[in-house]
Swiss-Prot record:
UniProt lineage: Eukaryota, Viridiplantae, Streptophyta, Embryophyta, Tracheophyta
NPA 1, short sequence motif: residues: 83-85
Name the record gives this protein: Probable aquaporin TIP2-1
GO MF annotations, alphabetized: water channel activity
Biological source species: Oryza sativa subsp. japonica
Transmembrane segments: 20-40, 54-74, 97-119, 141-161, 168-188, 217-237
Domain notes: Aquaporins contain two tandem repeats each containing three membrane-spanning domains and a pore-forming loop with the signature motif Asn-Pro-Ala (NPA).
Subcellular localization(s) per the UniProt record: Vacuole membrane
Keywords: Membrane, Repeat, Transmembrane, Transmembrane helix, Transport, Vacuole
Tissue expr: Expressed in roots and anthers.
Length: 248
């Protein structure tokens, strides 16, 4: 059962919430800068060569490490979402209000966009790689993104949002980084392995190319929402909203 709550302006503009937005902006910027930067660096080292297995592994590791750090540094302030699909999945489960979630989205999208614009500047105008499907249709890309984003948000629920997580919560950032790295290895050659609308939106802004960008909104949001429904209803059970300061 969907547990969406709209929220109030008072809560969404409280000092705690504003700090959370700033934390999401900074952490998303750092994550996207390292993630997209690793792809640009690969292109520089190979003179624009096609992605090979070693390059895929390197980029997956860079994303995993950057997300591990990004979630860690923001976790105590904002919950460490860094991803509109994670925010949406948590909203579906009643862990963040719609209004506060929208401001999370704005912070995440701004952070990702500025990260990519900075990369374009510091690399002397090098092309910013954007996500796009390869060897599959856009519909197949959507399904791929649904599956891998479901895995990501399910992991977030199991290690960070579940009230019974106990000491498991201490490994949440590394578990989240691991699932993202693994999913990039699996989906990178096909859909790009985004799992994150902000991670795809930032490069699209910097490159001025939004072709196929809808895939990386539709797929991740469906996958994240499904994970929120499944874990929230089947495993967490009764609706017990978490206080705003914990996840918002």
């Amino acid at each position: 059962m969907v547990k969406l709550a709209f929220g109030s302006l008072g809560d969404s503009f409280s000092a705690t919430s504003v700090k959370a937005y700033v934390a999401e902006f900074i952490a998303t910027l750092l994550f996207v800068f390292a993630g997209v930067g690793s792809a640009i660096a690969y292109g520089q080292l190979t003179n624009g060569g096609a992605l090979d297995p070693a390059g895929l592994v390197a980029i997956a590791i860079a994303h995993a490490l950057a997300l591990f750090v990004g979630v860690s540094v923001a976790a105590n302030i904002s919950g460490g979402h860094l991803n509109p699909a994670v925010t949406f999945g948590l909203a579906v489960g009643g862990h963040i209000t719609i209004l506060t979630g929208l401001f999370y989205w704005i912070a995440q999208l701004l952070g990702a966009s500025i990260a990519c614009l900075l990369l374009k500047f510091v690399t002397h105008g090098k092309a910013i790689p954007t996500h796009g499907v390869a060897g599959i249709s856009e519909l197949e890309g959507v399904v791929m993104e649904i599956v891998i984003t479901f895995a990501l948000v399910y992991t977030v629920y199991a290690t960070a949002a579940d009230p019974k997580k106990g000491s498991l919560g201490t490994i949440a950032p590394i578990a989240i980084g691991f699932i993202v790295g693994a999913n990039i290895l699996a989906a990178g050659p096909f859909s790009g392995g985004s799992m994150n609308p902000a991670r795809s939106f930032g490069p699209a802004v910097a490159a001025g190319n939004f072709a196929g960008n809808w895939v990386y909104w539709v797929g991740p949001l469906i996958g994240g929402g499904l994970a929120g429904l499944v874990y929230g209803d089947v495993f967490i059970g009764s609706y017990q909203p978490v206080a705003d300061q914990d996840y918002a």
